[in-house]
């Protein structure tokens, strides 16, 4: 079993999940980019935008509606929050934004109960897409969605050429699977296992999107535990 699947099976078994929102974000597409991928600001505009300190991403925020904006839709009872990475440069911010889109789109698919939701696939290689689809399908087969809240923090990115390494922590202590039909929440004890470290290798494609070519997770990671 992969580290990624093991990490999210913890979601299902112990009631810890990272997931979506009935939150709508319209963001600028990458159509204005030049052949070199455009500016970092343009590269980072599709998907979930970094927000000021620990502010929920979603309907509580006024998104900049732009031509060809993208929709992120997550369960009504769920909040996904990204802490900013103020020390990242413009290019690194583009990587962090695309990794955030991947993360949010994955849980959009979980929330919709649709393992074939196309959005997460735009930000993942075939191998990563297959891993994520397996997890989404598990939720779908059990009739689960997600509820509660997840905080994504300690986000980092390092770029070497057209390859980047991104990492982020997910605090999922307040997130749980919920039976879609009954609304029953699968509560369980939480602890250090509720802090997950995600690592992704990302490569920029011809459209300027940073796509995850590998993705792993680690539970109770020291780098993610509260100090």
Task: Please state what every model-predicted region is.
Residues 1, 89, 189-190:
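Secondary-structure junction/capping motif
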Residues 1, 107-111, 206:
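Secondary-structure transition/hinge residues
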Residues 1-8:
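Bacterial N-terminal signal peptides that target proteins for export
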Residues 9-97:
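Juxtamembrane and targeting peptides
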Residues 16, 115-226:
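Structured, amphipathic secondary-structure segments that form assembly/contact surfaces
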Residues 21, 103-107, 210:
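Aromatic side chains
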Residues 68-145:
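Core segments of small alpha/beta cavity-forming domains
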């Amino acid at each position: 079993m992969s580290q990624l699947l093991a990490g999210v099976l913890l979601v299902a078994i112990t009631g810890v999940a990272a997931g979506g929102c009935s939150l709508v974000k319209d963001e600028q597409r990458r159509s204005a980019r030049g052949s070199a991928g455009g500016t970092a600001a343009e590269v980072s505009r599709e998907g979930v935008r970094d927000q000021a300190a620990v502010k929920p991403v979603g309907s509580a925020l006024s998104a900049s509606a732009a031509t060809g904006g993208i929709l992120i839709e997550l369960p009504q009872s769920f909040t996904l929050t990204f802490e900013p990475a103020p020390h990242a440069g413009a290019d690194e911010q583009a990587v962090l934004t695309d990794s955030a889109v991947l993360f949010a789109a994955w849980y959009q698919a979980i929330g919709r109960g649709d393992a074939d939701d196309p959005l997460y696939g735009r930000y993942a290689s075939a191998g990563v897409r297959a891993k994520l689809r397996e997890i989404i399908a598990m939720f779908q087969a059990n009739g689960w969605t997600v509820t509660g809240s997840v905080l994504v923090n300690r986000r980092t990115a390092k770029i070497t050429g057209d390859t980047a390494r991104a990492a982020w922590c997910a605090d999922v202590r307040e997130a749980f699977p919920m039976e879609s039909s009954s609304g029953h929440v699968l509560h369980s004890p939480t602890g250090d296992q509720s802090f997950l470290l995600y690592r992704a290798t990302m490569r920029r494609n011809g459209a300027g999107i940073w796509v995850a070519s590998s993705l792993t997770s680690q539970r109770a990671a020291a780098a993610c535990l509260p100090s």
